[in-house]
Amino acid sequence: MSMFCYQCQEAAGGRGCTVKGVCGKTEDIAKTQDLIIYVVKGIAIYSSQAREMGLNTSEADKFIVESLFSTITNANFDAKALNARVQKGLKIRQSLKDAIIKAGGSYNSKENKSWTSKFLSVLGIKNDKDEKEIHDAAVWAANNPEDFKKKAETVGVLATENEDIRSLRELLTYGLKGMAAYLEHANNLGYDEDSIHAFMEKALVATLDDTLSADELTALVLECGKYGVDVMALLDKANTSTYGNPEITKVNIGVRNNPGILISGHDLKDMEELLKQTEGTGVDVYTHSEMLPANYYPAFKKYKHFVGNYGNAWWKQNEEFEAFNGPILMTTNCIVTPKASYKDRMYTTGVTGFEGVKHINTSKDGKKDFSEIIEHAKRCTSPKEIEKGEIIGGFAHNQVLALAPQVVDAVKTGAIKRFFVMAGCDGRMKSRNYYTDFAKALPKDTVILTAGCAKYKYNKLDLGDINGIPRVLDAGQCNDSYSLAVIALKLKEVFELEDINELPISYNIAWYEQKAVIVLLALLHLGVKNIHLGPTLPAFLSPNVAKILVENFGIGTISSVDEDIKMFMN
């Protein structure tokens, strides 16, 4: 069976990638990632039961989060690292199984189905009835890449034959991948929430359950949105408690004459470590793409060698990384297949990886040693200037709520007629120029609320302000879509409205990968309706599942700029 992947917006032909991923991943990488998900589901079978028995599941919890994150679009292309993850997962699954058997395999639960009997079956004492109750994901075993490869042939997306069940299972899985990304960042800062892990494991197990109906899976998808809100709130708390609340900031987009390191991705802990270790070395630090919002946090402003932001959204990195001249640190997705001209200057860390690119590991005490990349930078010339000037951002919920009197007054007087939430992702497709044209064509009495790399389609346009309020308010990274939800809920309260959809807010969101999926599900959980997704609807939505979203939540797509603005403003 050839590869099949349709988890991102650029799925080939709007259906799925079957030969090679548009993202650049090969068939082998795609299938190994499928196998990682299968292993994670097997672990979840045991960890969810171990949790109910009061056993320690921290190792499994961490592994599940990291593994889901590692399979997100443009995160990891390193076959060796991915195969090692499969191997490690099987060991963790076995240790959980052993712990449950040792504990007696019995616990108080209405769903208790004689775990002692099940594990006797696992150990070779077969009972036909019990044998059927254990899913293959919990029992299959292998110990080398060749056997992994054979197994991967059988466990991909298309292993679920029913189109609608497959669609719901994948929608749920992609929501979990986005959730895992946010939970990983919170965990790195010392913040966690057991209920989120418990839900993730419950949901993973549910994707293996052939007895669940489409309605039951739909309910789980919507429940996923609830935990999406929880995980974004947790990450917001982690970021702001550690680094302070983002504040209005003018960010330099030019360069200096010192050698520099370019840091891309989302992990603020990595940002902090890099700034600390480069201080006093003569090496400057620049953010790239989704790391831009690091410029808004008070804790990072004390570093005089933190220059600003270099470049644009992730998909332009081939030309921008080449021009930067210094080393690049990828803390998370999005990685584009590197050109030979800079591949030896590229470093990955965390769950990211690319074959032939140096990887910086985390030590046992949770620290990272960036000395190699710092010494590398010292041997490089300073970055080539590709633009200059400033952009403004830092409008997360705390900052916007501080401006609430101005904003409310502007709405009441009619100076602001409507807000447009244009959060989400950027991408390569030319059809995404729609978002630049849309921003330019919006009436002058409207304000754009944004988060994520979608902002790069319009954050350098001169769209002016309304009574001193910039017409583009950037809350931060994609997870800071949480801020936009907090702002909307506060405005609902201020204007004494019963329904969030009564606010003068329209949602025109550009999506690309799985973090956008969890943001969408979170918004649906909060009751937001009539969200428009573009530039295309997800390939993983079957016609029937798409119909559910349209009929129950008013999900729509985009058409032309003029038609859409007319529709939104009426």
From Swiss-Prot:
Residues that bind hybrid [4Fe-2O-2S] cluster: 266, 290, 334, 425, 453, 478, 513, 515
Disulfide feature: none
Top-level lineage group: Bacteria
GO molecular function terms attached to this record: 4 iron, 4 sulfur cluster binding; hydroxylamine reductase activity; metal ion binding; peroxidase activity
EC number: 1.7.99.1
Entry's cofactor comment: Binds 1 [4Fe-4S] cluster. Binds 1 hybrid [4Fe-2O-2S] cluster.
UniProtKB keywords: 4Fe-4S, Cytoplasm, Iron, Iron-sulfur, Metal-binding, Oxidoreductase
Gene3D superfamilies the record matches: 1.20.1270.20, 3.40.50.2030
Subcellular location: Cytoplasm
Residue numbers carrying Cysteine persulfide: 425
Main location: cytoplasm
Binding site for [4Fe-4S] cluster: 5, 8, 17, 23
A GO CC term attached to the entry: cytoplasm
One GO term (biological process): response to hydrogen peroxide
Cofactor(s) needed for function: [4Fe-4S] cluster; hybrid [4Fe-2O-2S] cluster
Pfam families reported in the protein's UniProt record: Prismane
Reactions this protein catalyses: A + NH4(+) + H2O = hydroxylamine + AH2 + H(+)
Protein role: Catalyzes the reduction of hydroxylamine to form NH(3) and H(2)O.
Family classification: Belongs to the HCP family.
Name of the protein in question: Hydroxylamine reductase
Native source species: Clostridium botulinum (strain Kyoto / Type A2)
Gene name in the database record: hcp
